């Protein structure tokens, strides 16, 4: 699997040598060889590639990757250009519109957020096609817990957006009083009406960053139309 190239590399170097990770790597080699696994092997660590450790301002925790063809590309909630926007992301865009007035874009490609310091991290980084949660309990949780712990150690204030029970289970790892946690139900159609809509996470995130002297996030995802990415 591709090795990290930016400032995450030295921070996670030891993690890649731990017995749980070596076991996970062998499991994934066999899975990718014999089944259809998402995302592409070269996209697994995109959350870390697009958002270097030094740049992290916001952590948006997801669960596991989308399990439909062509959707997942290593960023939580994001899909590749040209792929229909999934229901949870539709609801995120609705809340963004109601919160900050951003127009609803024609795509769900969230790389713009990642490049501004929004770490779009799933707690499990791979999945079998058509089988949600199929790689749960295989070792990824240990790895992403370490990522969360490293962000928690940062001196710069960070906002953690914890949507849904799975994400909120990570709250105990966020102990640094400099950071700010915003919790809400998951944006899934099954739970969005129970408090996700109306909780204004985007304006609250920017208010906190501004108060701390950090640049706010430009949350508007632009239309890309027929243009290839």
UniProtKB/Swiss-Prot annotation:
It is an enzyme of class 3 (hydrolase). The keyword Phosphoprotein does not apply. Disulfide bonds: none annotated. It catalyses: Hydrolyzes single-stranded DNA or mismatched double-stranded DNA and polynucleotides, releasing free uracil. The active site is at 64 (proton acceptor). Its EC number is 3.2.2.27. Its main location: cytoplasm. Keywords: Cytoplasm, DNA damage, DNA repair, Hydrolase. The keyword RNA-binding does not apply. It is found in: Cytoplasm. SUPFAM superfamilies: Uracil-DNA glycosylase-like. PROSITE patterns: U_DNA_GLYCOSYLASE. Coiled coil: none annotated. GO terms for biological process: base-excision repair, AP site formation via deaminated base removal. One of its GO terms (molecular function) is uracil DNA N-glycosylase activity. Gene3D superfamilies: Uracil-DNA glycosylase-like domain. One of its GO terms (cellular component) is cytoplasm. Excises uracil residues from the DNA which can arise as a result of misincorporation of dUMP residues by DNA polymerase or due to deamination of cytosine. Belongs to the uracil-DNA glycosylase (UDG) superfamily. UNG family. NCBIfam families: PRK05254.1-1 (NF003588), PRK05254.1-2 (NF003589), PRK05254.1-4 (NF003591), PRK05254.1-5 (NF003592), ung (TIGR00628). This is Uracil-DNA glycosylase. It comes from Geobacillus thermodenitrificans (strain NG80-2).
